[in-house]
Amino acid sequence: MERIKTIVEALDDKRAKNIDVLDISKLTSLGDYFIICSCGSDTQVRACVDNVEEKMDELEITCVHKEGYTNGTWVLMDYGDIIVHIMHEEPRLFYALEKLWDDAVKIVVDTTDEV
């Protein structure tokens, strides 16, 4: 869960919206988790991608594959068991990945630092 929390916090730091974490482990062999978020611009999408990569690099975890960075509308980041989708709001609504994976368990990630 540390890796998931790191990714969610990195997205939140760059003001990504509607961050959803889906446990897909019982539904597919593609991975264990999807993390999906919305951004308002290409610049914000790239900022989120860069921040996720930076924070994961700090944990010595490298992105296995990345698609869509140049376009900036929808970037997929593959961390093996965690797949991150950083999308503009329009394609997110159109493709509705959450509905496609409706049987997945939604995970709540607490990003507050308790003292």
Summary of predicted features, one role per range:
Residues M77-Y79:
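Active-site beta-strand termini and strand-to-loop segments that position acidic
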Residues M1-L30, C39-V75, E89-L93, L100-V115:
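Polybasic/polar functional segments that serve as interface/processing modules
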